[in-house]
Amino acid sequence: FTHGGHPYTFGPRHFLTKDEKLFGFLNEYVPMRQIPEHEFLTYIERDQRFYHFPIHRDEVSEMPDAEQIESELEACPDEVSPENLEQFWVQSVGPTLYDKFINSYSKKMWQIESNTELTEFGYTAKGVALKTGPNKACWNEAISAFPVAQNGYDDYFDVSTAETTVHLSTRIEKVDVDKSRALIDGEWRDYDILINTVSPEFILNGAFGPLRWMGRDFFKIVLPVPEVFPENVYFLYYANQEPFTRIVEYKKFYRYESPMTLIGLEIPSNRNKLYPFTTKKDYAKAKLYHDALPENVFSIGRAASYRYLDVAPIIQQSMDMRAELEVGRVRPAA
């Protein structure tokens, strides 16, 4: 999308992977610019300052409660065995750092009363719980990149659909997964396979009840300066009582020339379905939906998988699907 001539996406869509082969594949079709310098900052209101995230060990000494934090870090176990997100962070960095950086932010992000509700949390630490060393970039253990072109990933969709017939502005009225067909413009159309990219509750008519989701209200704000964030900082997180969670400066990603800059401000919302709830209970309900789908129906992407996936694992899902079809592990519908 563009706003006032500024390119943006609904939420940042930087590419993250540890798989060099996967990065090479995408880079062949959509030239990518690696951004290893990518940093996050989190505003901690009680300290009246920003700190890096992941939490950096070197910045603890700059905190007003450093002595308390140091004693808590000393008491942290060498290996953690958490049952929920709160336990993960308290065991990893102690209660004070957890309360500063995670407690309010996570409750705000998911609109929950307690972080003990979140029982699946492998994505939360942005790589590590407590970062050390001179490099304060977020993703120095993975490839962090973004498309060079101003249209972002759009060219990838042209490549991936080059040998298909694409029906634009088409509404699917109903899906019959058992017969591998879809009702379009009042006519049933049969297909060998179905690839679903929306929540499985839609194509199975809510058979097992609604899945829980969190969404975002997204506000685009143009500012009359060329750049507002510090060098190498792409995101700002807010871990306090303000209603918003994150601000993104899109010029950092797109590198376009303008005397102004666009920021995107995100507020948790129930208006859309963008983030699947990361609990065993919610995953179990999603599994009921997935298990009810015939083998020729593939669930691809964050919504269909009901997993907190980004660009790289979604491309990998598509590659895995192709591999299954090529070796005949999945038979097309009769």
Place the predicted regions along the sequence by residue.
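A short acidic, glycine-rich active-site loop
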Residues: F10-R13, F146-P147, K220
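Structural/interface elements that position substrates and couple domains in central-metabolism enzymes
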Residues: G24-E28, F88, L97, E231-Y237, ...
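Short catalytic/ligand-binding loop motif for oxyanion handling, primarily in non-cytosolic enzymes
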Residues: T42-I44, Y51-F53, Y98, K108-S114, ...
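Mid-domain catalytic core of redox enzymes
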Residues: E173-S180, G186-Y289
